[in-house]
Amino acid sequence: MILRRLVLAGSLLLATAFTSAKKADSPIITATRFDHEPINLFYFGDSDVVMLQDIKNGDVYVSRDAGVKWDMVNLDGLKGQALSLWSHPTDRTKAYILGKAGKHWVTNDQAKSWHEFSADVEFFQSLYPLVFHGKDSDRVLLQGQKCFGRDCKEVTYYTTDGFKTVDILMENARGCNWAVSTPIFGDGLNLSKEVNDRIFCIVPGLQSPWSDYNRLLYSDRFFKQDPGTEAPLDSGRAVSGVVRTASVKKYLLAAAKSARTSELALYVTDDGSQWHRAEFDGHRVEEDAYTVLESTNYSIQIDVVAETPSAPMGRLFTSNSNGTYFTRNIDHTNRNSLGFVDFEKIANIQGIILVNTVKNWEDVEMSALVEKKIISQISFDDGRTFQPLKAGKHDLHLHSVTHLSNSGRVFSSPAPGLVMGVGNTGGHLKDYYDGDLYVSDDAGITWRKALDEAHKYEFGDQGSVIVAIFDEGRTGKISYSLNHGKDWKEASLPDGIKIRARILTTMPDSTGLKFLLVGSAKKDSEVEHYVISISFTDMEERTCGKDDFETWPARLNEKNEPDCLMGHKQFYQRRKADVDCFIKKKFQEPVPQFEPCKCTVEDFECDFNFIRSTDGKSCVPARNLPVPEGACKKPDDKYMGSSGFRLIPGNACIREGGVELDKQIERVCTDTLTVPVSGEIAVQKTFFTADNYKGYFYLERKDSSKGDDETVIMITSELQIYITRDHGKIWKEIFPGESITRIVPHQYFDDVAYFLTNSGDGWYTLDRGENFRTFKVPIPPNQDKLPVLSFHPERRDWLIWTGAVECKTRGPQCHSVAYYSTNHGSEWHFLMQYVRRCEFIKREARGSSNNLVFCEQFENENPLNHHLQLLSTDDWFSEKKVHYNNILDFATMQEFIIVAVRGEKPQDSLSVGVSVDGETFAYADLPANVQIPVQRAYTVLESRTHAAFLHVTVNNIEDHEYGSILKSNSNGTSYVLSLSAVNRNTYGYADFEKMQGMEGVAMANVVGNVADVEKGAAKKYRTMITHNDGAEWTLLSPPSKDSEGRDYSCSTKGGKPTDKCALHLHSYTERVDPRDTYSSPAAIGVMLGTGNVGEYLTLKSEADTFITRDGGITWEEVKKDKYQWEFGDSGSIIVIVPESRPTKTLFYSLDEGKSWKEFQFSEVEMLIRDISTVPSDTSRNFLLWGNEVGNGKKPGIATVNVDFSNLKERHKQCVLNEEKPEADDYYLWEPIHPFQPNGCLFGHRAKYHRKRPDRDCFIGRELQHLDSIGDICECTRSDYECDYNYEPQIDGTCAPVPGLQPLDPKLICMEDPKAVEWYEPTGYRRIPLTKCEGGKQLHHIIPHACPNKEEEFLKKHPGLRGVGLFFVVMGPIGLAAAIGYYVYTRWDGKFGRIRLGDTGSGGFFASDSLFISIPVAIVAGVVAVATALPLLASSLWRSVKGYARVPGGSSSQRVYSSRAAFAAQRADYVGVVDDEDELLGAEDFDEEENDDRGQV
C-alpha cells in the first residue's frame, strides 16, 4: 500500500518501447514510454505478471513478461471507469478493479480473465475499500458510502464466493474487519467455525452519532436476522468509543477513546472471542499517538508517542505472546507527524530490528524549534538491547521509514543477510542528499560504503544481484553488483534516456533476475514517463552448484557465535559473495534451517495475571490471583500456584537441561486479595487550615484512561490549593507560596487543568495532576474580566490566550489581544486585537476546518462604539469573514451556533442567528407573538436532542422574572412555543433541567400565578415534566402516601395530578451548587428532588425528599425533611445527608431507594455543605464537605471520605453477559411514555441495562446502559409537536397564533436546490428525536411539485397524472371546505386546535382523527414552513448542562458566563480571579461545559 501513496501521478498512455543493445556481459534494458505517470503497480505472486493503472483515464495495463511489453485490459464498460487497482495480499491469482459507476471487476487467474460484479458504492480515502479474510481468499468485504445528494452514509458489502454474489453486510458501519484477518490468526487455538465466519464492525452509538459513542459489534451470520452482539472488550463488558480496529500477525486490536480525554485504551484478542486490555508499563497511549509496527508471530510491536507537546518522538514497546502486557524497549524513537516511525525488522530473520532515535531529545522536548539529531541503532535480540551501526570504526546513521524514497521495505528484502541504506557516518544523520549508499551482508553487524551519493536499490536472485540508481537527480545509467555490493558495474539506459527515478522494484520474493524501474524524463517542456525492464537472465553467468553456497548463521551473539532466539538458532544456505554464478531458483524463497537450544531465561514471559517487576527480573501479580478450587479456607493458608512465568507460546527450546522458570511454586493465600474484605464502610476525615473552601473540581479518569485514581482539586478560602488522588483520603498541598489566582480546567479534556498566576504564567497538568509542567504566556491576562483561555474541542494542545497590552495605567490605549498556540503554549502566534472573546468552533457534528475560529471584535478596533462584530477565519485571520456587524453575544453548542443580533435601532428586538456548520448563518423564525426586547434576555438551554431550546424572557422585573421556552426544528432555524411562564431568576438562569441518560425527559418550574405576578404579587411555582422532548407537558404525579404511610392533604383525580394536587420540586435556580442535579447519566431512570405535594411549591425549609425510578412517571417520598444526595456506583449506591442542619449520620440505599440504612460518619456533629463523587457517578467513594459544629469541634473546613468499596454487599463485581443480558445481575428496562399504551417512546422501544436491586455486587466502571433499540414503532400523534406559528394550549391542543400572515411553503424549493416537492402545512411537525416510521404522516399530507421539477415529481408519484392528479389536488380543497363548514358549525369550540395528546378511538370525528385534523389545519389557513439551512440531517449531543448568557442593555445584570459562576456567588471570587470562567469557573463545576446550555 505504500506504493499507491508514493506514486501520485496523472495517468499513463502507452506509447513506444526502447531496448538497449543486447550484450552477454550486461543486463538487457527495455524502456516503455507512457504519457502519464503510472500508479498502483504490483506483481502477482510467483509470476512475471505485473499490473499498473492510468489514473487519468482509468485504463488498466498488464505485462506478462515482467514489464517488457504492456497490454491494455479491455473489458466492456471499463473504459474510463476504473478508480483504483488492488492486488489480493495472500492469493497470488486475484486482483480487483474498483469502478466509478457501481461496476467492479475481479480476476482469479492473474488477469487472464475478468468477472464483473455490481455494488452501489462510492469510495473515500479514510477507509480501505477491500478487507480480506486471512484464510479464505474468496471472502472479501467491500466498504464505501452511498450518497444521495449531500447526504452520504457508509455501506459495507460482503462476498463469500469471490464476488460471484455480493450482499449488503451493513449500512452506517464505520469500518469492518474479519476476525480471521491474517493467515496465521488462531493458529494452534482450534478456532470454532463461528469465529471463521465472524465479522467485527464499528457502528454509531444507539442514541448518538458521535465517535465517543461508537460500538464494536460482531456477528457470525453476516448480521442476517442478527443485529450483532457488542464485543466484550473489557472484562466481559462492552466498551463505547471504539475508533478503529487493526489486524497484525495473529492479533486483532481495537482502540477505544472515551469522551473528554485524549487517552486511548487498546484491546487485543488472539482468538476473536476473549479480549484483554493492553497495559503499557504505566505509559499513556494518546489518540492518534501510536503506531502498530511490523510484529512477530509471538508479539506485537507498538510505538507510542512520548508525552511532549513539541516534535514527535516515541517509545517502542513489545508485548507478551497474547498481546496484553507491553514492555518498553527503547525511548525517543524518531517519528513524523503522519505517524510513521523509523523502525524496520530485517526480513526473514528473527530478532533483528533497526531503529532511529533522537539524540538531542531533551532539547527537542524543550522547544519545537530545535532540529532533531537522529542516530541509528540496531538490535540483535528482539529489542532487548540496542547498539550503534558501525562502518569501520565510525557510527553509521541511515534514513528510514520517515524518509521513504522507494516502495516496499527500506533496508532489507528476502535475500538472506543483505541490508542496504542511504546515510552517513558521524555524530548524527544528515540530509538525504548528503548521504551515500551503504551495504551490509551480515544482517547489519558490519557496514561498508557501496556507492557515493544517494541511490535507490533493490535485490534479486536471493541477493546475487543488487541494482541501484542515482536518486539525487536525473541519470542515464544504473549500477549493479554481483558480489554483495563489493564491486559495481554500470549499464546505460536505452536511447540516451535520462530519468528521475521514482520506483525501483522486483518480484516480492526477490528470487528473480528481472527488475522494474519507474521514472520520468524531460523532453523539451514536456514530461515523459517510463517503465523500464532490467533483465539479467541472459547474462553469461553459470547456475550455482552445491559448493557455491555457505551455511550462514542469521544471528551472532557478542562472542560472534550463532545466537538463540525463541529456542533455536537460525541458518540459511546462501550463495558465497565472490562466486561467479546465479542461483536461478525463481519463485523459491530461501528456507531457514533451525537448530534447537536449551531453555534460558529469555524463553519465558510473564504468565496471565502477572507483569514484569520494576527491575524486569521477575514477574509479580498484576491483580487479584484466582483462588484454586478448595484452597484458601484461611488467609494464612498456602497453595501451589503459578511462578509468574510461562514458556512463550511457539518457543521451541529444549526443556531437558534448561531453565524451568514456569515450575509451580508455593504461594500464600494473601496473594489472592489485594485488600481484605472488612465488610464495613471506611471513613477518613481531613481538616484544613481554612474556614471554608472556595471551590473544588474533579479531574476524572475516563474508561479509556489507565490507572485507578480519583483526583480532586480544591482551593480553600485562604487560597491554598490541595490535590487528592484517592478521593479525599490523602490530600497534598500543591504550589505553596506561588500565588495561584486562576485555576482553569480544560473545557473538553478532563485530564487537563491550568494553574495561573497574576502574570498569566503558571503550570498545567495533562495527566490529572500526576505531573505538572510550566506554562508561559505571550502577554499578561486581560483586565476586562474576559476568559483568558479558550480550548479546542478535539485538539487538546490548541489554545487561544486573550491577554492585554498597554494596560499599566488602564488608559484608553489598554486593549485585549488574542494569541493562539497549537503546541500547548510552546509557541504563540498573534491572532487578533480588540477582541472580546475568541473560540474554536470545530465540532464533530460540523464538517468545518479544525482551524475555524470565531472572534467578537469591536468594529474598526474601537471599543467606544460598542459595536461587536462576529468574525470567523480558518487561516488564523490571514483572511476573515464578517457574519454580523452588531451582536450582543454568541453561544456555541455541539449542534448549533446561536447569535444574539442587535437591531438597527435601540428599540428593535433581538434577532436570533443560527448556524450548524459555522460558515452559513440564517435568521431563526420565532413565533410572531414572542419578541425579545433589547432590555431583556434569552437563554440557550440545550441542544442534544436534534433541537435547541431557548428561554425567552417575558417579564424581567426583579423577583418577578419568567419567560417562555421555545423549541427549534432540527437545524435550529424554526421555533415553536413549548412551555409558557417558565421561572427564571435575576441572573437569567431558568428552572429547566433535562434528565440525564434518557431521551426527551425534562422538568421545568413554571409560574402558576402569572396574572397575579403581573400585578406585583410574589411568584408561586409548579413543576412540569415532559416525556417527549417538550411536545407535551404535565404536572408531576404525587405519591399516594408519604414516607410514614400517611395520606396527603390533597387528592388526585384517578391517580393523575391536578392543579390542586401535584408534586412540586425545587429546581435549578435555588441550588447552591449547580452540579446537584435531579438525575445521573449512570443511574438510568432514577431522580431525586426536594419539594412538597400540593397546589404550589412551598418554602425549601418545608421540603421533603422524593425519588422516582421510572423516569419521572411515579414518585415516592424518601424521607421527611430536605436532604442532599449523590449517586454512586452507577446508582447501586445512593447516599443522602441532611441539608442545612447538623448531623453525625448519613443514610444510604443499595436498592434504588426502596430501603435505607443509617451510618455514622463522625463522632462530632457536622454541618455538611455539599456531598460529591466523581461526575460520572461510578465511584464507590463519596466526599462530604463541611465543618464540625458540635461539642469537641475542631476548627477549619473538613472533608470526609466515605468509602463503600469494602462493604460486603458491594465487594463482588456484577456480571453482565452481552449475549444474554438478563442472565446474571442485570435486567433490561424499557422506559415508556405515560400516555402511550404500546410502550413506544420517540417511535421506538429502547432497552437499558439496569442492575437488579436485590443483587449484592458492584457495577464498577461506567456501564453502557443502552442495550438496544428494539422495534421501530409506527408514527402516532406523540411523535409530532406544534409546527411554526402554532402554539400549545392549556388543554394540550395546538392552535394557530392569532393574526399571523402565513409563510410561503414553497420556500423549501428556493432554499434547497435538490427539493422536488413542497407540502401544504398541517400544523404538525415531527419531533426531531423520533425514529418512528409509517403510521400517521401528519406533517406531509398534500404534496406539490417545485417549479421546474414537475418531471421528477411525477416520477416520485407515478400515479398522479391527468384526471387522477386533478382529483388529488382539487379533492382536498372541496373536502376541506365541506368538512371545514361542518367543523365550524358542529365542533366543540376548539376550532383550529390540533391536539397532540392521548391517542384514542373516538370514531370519525374523534379529536385524534387524521380526517378531522387536516381539514381543520386547511380551514385555519395557517402555513408553516421551516426556513431551513440544508446543512444538517441529524445529530445528537450528550448530556451537558452549561449556560452562556446574552444580556440586555446597560442596565441589565452583569454577564455570568456559566451557571457555575452564578452558583459560586461572584463575591466569593473577588481577589482570586478576574474573570468568571477561570477559577473553577464556567467549565469546572462538573463536566458541564459552557458548550451546551447557554444563557444568552
From Swiss-Prot:
Subcellular location: Golgi apparatus, trans-Golgi network membrane; Prevacuolar compartment membrane
Pfam families: Sortilin-Vps10, Sortilin_C
Coiled coil (residue ranges): none
Residue intervals on the Lumenal side: 22-1362, 1431-1496
Transmembrane segments: 1363-1383, 1410-1430
Membrane topology: Multi-pass membrane protein
Signal sequence segment: 1-21
Record GO biological process: Golgi to endosome transport; Golgi to vacuole transport; protein targeting to vacuole
Positions of BNR repeats: 61-71, 377-387, 438-448, 480-489, 722-732, 819-829, 1106-1116, 1147-1157
Keywords, alphabetical: Glycoprotein, Golgi apparatus, Membrane, Protein transport, Receptor, Repeat, Signal, Transmembrane, Transmembrane helix, Transport
Residues carrying sugar: N190, N297, N322, N971
Domain of life, per lineage: Eukaryota
Gene3D superfamilies in the record: 2.10.70.80, 3.30.60.270, YVTN repeat-like/Quinoprotein amine dehydrogenase
GO cellular component terms given for this protein: cytosol; Golgi apparatus; membrane
Matching InterPro entries: Sortilin_C (IPR031777), Sortilin_N (IPR031778), VPS10 (IPR006581), VPS10-sortilin (IPR050310), WD40/YVTN_repeat-like_dom_sf (IPR015943)
Cytoplasmic domain ranges by topology: 1384-1409
PANTHER family according to UniProt: SORTILIN RELATED, SORTILIN-RELATED RECEPTOR
Cited function: Functions as a sorting receptor in the Golgi compartment required for the intracellular sorting and delivery of soluble vacuolar proteins, like carboxypeptidase Y (CPY) and proteinase A. Executes multiple rounds of sorting by cycling between the late Golgi and a prevacuolar endosome-like compartment.
Family classification: Belongs to the VPS10-related sortilin family.
Protein name: Vacuolar protein sorting/targeting protein 10
Species per Swiss-Prot/TrEMBL record: Paracoccidioides lutzii (strain ATCC MYA-826 / Pb01)
